[in-house]
Amino acid sequence: NPSNPIVHTFSEGNLRLTGTTTNWDSACSTIGASSGKWYFEMKFLALYGGLRRAAMGLVDARDQSLLMTNEYGYIVTGAVGDCVGYNGNGSSNNIKKNDNNVANGTQWSVNDIICMAADLDNGAVYFRVNDSAWLNSANPESGASKTGAVTITVGEDYVFGGTAYGNTTDWQFNYGAPS
């Protein structure tokens, strides 16, 4: 979102995000939503210092400008809503909500595709790596039961995006959305 401050570089029609080596800053999309089912993919392109330094997720739209100096999954001072992220924070990969570790994720490697399905009607977010099973035994097709999902507040406006630190990520589709 160009109205938010960011130190990263966008290229290739804003589908590629290259991070600086000094900040865990995030980038939010210009698309916000409060309902519906949404699907996103992020291709992880490079390690930084031998570590995974990227994340993807969603944040309450009221908090997006606060998140710009942090990463998805962490809450920042003054935030009022939920922030969920799948973080490649160093040598581990975790699913986080508002600073809390919700589940351990699969460690991704260079060229892996990180996938996120968000069911805003039922308040559920799901993650997977490549075309493998959804993490935490999750099932985006479970609807209102939210099997294995990270739960979020229904009815809020959310924006989607990613975080990069000294590396590059691509945002284009490689796999299909859950049906």
Predicted regions and their residues:
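PRY/SPRY (B30.2) beta-sandwich protein-interaction domains
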Residues: 1-179
